[in-house]
Amino acid sequence: MDRSANIPISLQATENKNDLFCTSHEINTYPLGHLLLMETAGKERERITELITQLALRGSFNLIAGDEWPPDRDTLTRSIRRYTVEVEETLDRPSLRRPMTCLQLLDLLMEVDMQRRPTLILNFFHHFYDADVDLSLRDRILEQCCQYLKRLSISNSIVVLVPRVSTVDYQRFFPILAAVANEIIPVEETYEIEVSQGLLF
């Protein structure tokens, strides 16, 4: 059976059974771009580090860290060194941005729109959970962010990771983001495949 990592072709490095979030889905050649939404169980730090490594081996891409945690340079160095001796060159390929508010996230998406590169976004909803910001404003900014994500996906592959949490806000926000995605992989499917096929770490 053909087993491929469920990462869009334009973001995908060489096939490897240890690639992040391998699934039984067959990967098609997506037209121009693709918006993939993936739920995760918590932060998934080791797996996300591996995903960033695989994308960096493939080429340059935008990396937007929604929360305070992207892997540090030492962690990425150790991960990349397992695959290539061109460590410094590979480390420079992710263009890391760290918005501090949902408004800054919107600004970053507008900037990324002009760069024409694949984009990986970690913990997309993080700043939308800020209760100090009026909910109606968060709703409005989220709608605008989703519009820009959809626009970005016309010409580039976009991967958005969202840790699933049992909150009212998550249940409110997730359908808005899901409505613009080309493909959604829920956390249950990821773990069913991990248990049944051993395709994940």
Where are these regions (language model features)?
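Conserved nucleotide-binding/hydrolysis micro-motifs of P-loop NTPases
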Residues: 69-71, 100, 126-127, 165-167
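Charged, amphipathic alpha-helical linker segments immediately N-terminal to NTP-binding catalytic cores
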Residues: 2-12
